[in-house]
């Protein structure tokens, strides 16, 4: 059994609406349906081949793994509308993050903030925070996974990553956005 904490569980109608809306926004208006290989048929008949061609076009446009993972990552991490994340924001310069984390007990995801990730190639990930995507690799990808998998991340788990500039930048941006807070 899987228990989901903090992410949205969409209805099928929300999924269809979201995917189609996203496809319309990102779609190419210049592409047209064509069926040059259509076999002769009765003038009023919609042939099974035509239906199969439309189905194939829809599958290519809407059901690619890349398209769906992008939409789902943004959808499930869309922040709660009744929470003001900026109220939690603490501006910390990337160069000072390591010292801040060293004094901390934990990094805590703020109420209403949502994190998720999808795996890419060679250890890279797409990291989704509050509806926004950031592509990460290396240590930053590993740190992002730790942050996505826990609501409260003990500082001793984060500290080894703080020698990496990209990790410092990641934590600084999450603190500045109000997505994380430092527990001292």
Mark where each language-model region is:
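Short capping segments at the starts of secondary-structure elements
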Residues: 145-160
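Short amphipathic alpha-helical interaction segments
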Residues: 161-176
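Alpha-helix initiation and N-capping motif
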Residues: 9, 13, 140, 167-168
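A conserved active-site cap/scaffold subdomain adjacent to cofactor or substrate pockets
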Residues: 1-69
């Amino acid at each position: 059994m899987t228990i989901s904490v903090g992410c949205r569980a969409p209805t099928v109608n929300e999924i269809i609406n979201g995917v189609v809306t996203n496809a319309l926004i990102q779609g190419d208006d210049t592409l047209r349906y064509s069926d040059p290989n259509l076999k002769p048929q009765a003038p009023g008949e919609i042939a099974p081949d035509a239906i199969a061609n439309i189905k194939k076009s829809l599958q290519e446009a809407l059901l690619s793994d890349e398209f769906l993972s992008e939409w789902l990552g943004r959808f499930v991490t869309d922040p709660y509308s009744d929470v003001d994340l900026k109220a939690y924001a603490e501006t910390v310069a990337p160069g000072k993050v390591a010292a801040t984390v060293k004094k901390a007990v934990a990094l805590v995801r703020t109420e209403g903030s949502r994190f998720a990730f999808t795996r890419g190639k060679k250890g890279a990930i797409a990291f989704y925070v509050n509806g926004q995507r950031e592509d990460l690799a290396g240590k930053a990808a590993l740190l992002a996974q730790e942050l996505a998998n826990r609501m409260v991340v003990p500082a001793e788990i984060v500290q080894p990553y703080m020698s990496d500039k990209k990790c410092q930048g990641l934590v600084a941006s999450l603190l500045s956005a109000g997505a994380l807070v430092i527990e001292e």
